[in-house]
Amino acid sequence: MAGAKEIRNKIGSVKSTQKITKAMEMVAASKMRRSQDAMEASRPYAETMRKVIGHVANANLEYRHPYLEEREAKRVGYIIVSTDRGLCGGLNINVFKKAVTDIQTWKEKGAEIELAVIGSKATAFFKHGGAKVAAQVSGLGDSPSLEDLIGSVGVMLKKYDEGELDRLYVVFNKFVNTMVQQPTIDQLLPLPKSDSKEMQREHSWDYIYEPEPKPLLDTLLVRYVESQVYQGVVENLACEQAARMIAMKAATDNATNLIEDLELVYNKARQAAITQELSEIVGGASAV
């Protein structure tokens, strides 16, 4: 029965693992709901900021902020959002592939690349790949705040202000639904113009700035970049919890199937052992 005993021990081990994955699935489901609430609460602000900035970029302004000016892209920056923890399927790999593909396109055009990374997974991946990382932040937890991101975003904005960057993008996973997380690249700088003809038609007027356009735009445009990065972080967090819940459910289901297979093997081994013992008993009785 040595073989059967080993199988029984393996069944016990898989059942213990199954309890862990089931618990992680339930925790991820709870965290996903909270993350979705935070994401949905911040989405209207981020989308409104994007619309306003799109209109500003299309307008004939008295003051042309540097963030509105197109320039030759010789140096390109990316703010890449990832998770701090694993066990979330291919979530990080998918967003890294998206970023690497876009980075390679710019490199082929002769552009230099510089990164700011959010999340320990992105830090490990891009540093291992030899990328130039200008700023990094990790350990944001399940409730990230805008203040946690200002430092890294500020580093990239300063580089843009000083002419060390000509383009700035944010890369993150966009939450579509529980089953779908979409790797996304959004241009932050120079400010993308609104491409909606309907919005351009409805809001073809210019803004009136009080008291002066320069201080107002200086503050507004920085706040816009910060809000878009923050939205990317909370979207990515909701994606992380959804992906982890799905991954842990798959692991739990696989454990159930494995236990059934092992129990079948165990029963066959036990039956074979009993049959062998009976054969030995019958053989011994016949000999007597």
From Swiss-Prot:
It is found in: Cell inner membrane. It is a peripheral membrane protein. InterPro entries: ATP_synth_F1_ATPase_gsu, ATP_synth_F1_gsu, ATP_synth_F1_gsu_CS. Its main location: membrane. This is ATP synthase gamma chain. It comes from the Bacteria. Produces ATP from ADP in the presence of a proton gradient across the membrane. The gamma chain is believed to be important in regulating ATPase activity and the flow of protons through the CF(0) complex. GO terms for cellular component: plasma membrane; proton-transporting ATP synthase complex. One of its GO terms (molecular function) is proton-transporting ATP synthase activity, rotational mechanism. Belongs to the ATPase gamma chain family. GO terms for biological process: proton motive force-driven plasma membrane ATP synthesis. Keywords: ATP synthesis, Cell inner membrane, Cell membrane, CF(1), Hydrogen ion transport, Ion transport, Membrane, Transport. F-type ATPases have 2 components, CF(1) - the catalytic core - and CF(0) - the membrane proton channel. CF(1) has five subunits: alpha(3), beta(3), gamma(1), delta(1), epsilon(1). CF(0) has three main subunits: a, b and c.
